[in-house]
């Protein structure tokens, strides 16, 4: 058994900065980063064609950050996680939570099965500013309308934590027995050439997401209150796909904008509206 080796299971957290599961796994010792394409349990929730193009490009960028040590697999994660843990004698798995109902149901089964095999699981929140179960009305029931949910619930709760630094160094465990797929074997890219329009139109990956945020905060947030209603204007953040795939964390975005208020920005209405819409968008991610 490799006690100081853990599996870091990548999902919608395609980044190194502000990544709680990655940071925790690195602190434990050497890691095996793995991405599993799950078209088995997703049913009607399978990733669409455009999303697959984005995912392919983002995984390519992430693999570079992981020094080409990222393991690729496709199939049922419940089976694949057990297989790699048994083949490589791993007893700890770290991941960041995803909150779609079908994913929650699948992950509960995975946790139960791994516990029977005496494999530890450690999950973290990297996708939401507040955990859903932490924001409740005074009578401990869920909010049903967004405005009171955000104004009374979220803004009166503990402020989202500040983003975490990426690991200064990562030790990788050399996988000896589990065979990784090549990224192209995930078959994420369609055969049709329309995929090239997405690739040419967007800068994809963590570095691109950070650049996009910085540009938005520096030059485009001013005037957001009015400009957000016109997609052709510069005031649209274009952060949505980066947030969806976890190339940048909501905490990073939140505090980058909040820090402007502390610097005395003139247009606080712009920042307030943007932050409320970040809260709304993350409910639907």
Predicted regions and their residues:
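Trp/Phe/Arg-rich N-terminal binding region typifying the photolyase-homology
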Residues: 1-161
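Glycine/tryptophan-enriched, flexible segments
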Residues: 141-282
């Amino acid at each position: 058994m490799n006690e100081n080796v853990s599996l870091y299971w990548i999902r919608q957290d395609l980044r190194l900065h502000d990544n709680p599961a990655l940071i925790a796994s690195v602190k434990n010792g050497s890691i095996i980063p793995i991405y599993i394409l799950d078209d088995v349990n997703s049913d009607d929730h399978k990733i669409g064609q455009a999303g697959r193009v984005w995912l392919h490009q983002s995984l390519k960028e992430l693999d570079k950050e992981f020094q080409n040590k990222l393991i690729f697999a496709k199939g049922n994660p419940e089976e694949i996680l057990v297989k790699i843990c048994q083949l490589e004698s791993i007893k700890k798995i770290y991941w960041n939570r995803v909150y779609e109902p079908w994913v929650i149901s699948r992950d509960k089964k995975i946790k139960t099965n791994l516990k029977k095999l005496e494999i530890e699981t450690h999950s973290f929140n990297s996708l939401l500013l507040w955990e859903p179960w932490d924001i409740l009305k005074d009578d401990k029931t869920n909010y049903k309308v967004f405005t009171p949910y955000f104004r009374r619930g979220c803004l009166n709760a503990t402020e989202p934590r500040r983003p975490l630094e990426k690991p200064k160094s990562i030790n990788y465990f050399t996988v000896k027995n589990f065979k990784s797929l090549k990224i192209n074997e995930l078959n994420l890219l369609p055969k049709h050439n329309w995929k090239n329009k997405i690739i040419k139109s967007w800068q994809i990956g963590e570095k691109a997401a950070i650049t996009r945020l910085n540009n938005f905060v520096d030059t485009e947030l001013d005037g957001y209150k009015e400009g957000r209603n016109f997609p052709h204007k510069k005031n649209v953040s274009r952060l949505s796909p980066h947030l969806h795939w976890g190339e940048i964390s909501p905490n990073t975005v939140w505090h980058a904008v909040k820090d402007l208020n502390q610097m005395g920005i003139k247009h606080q209405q712009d920042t307030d509206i943007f932050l409320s819409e970040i809260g709304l968008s993350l409910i639907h991610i």
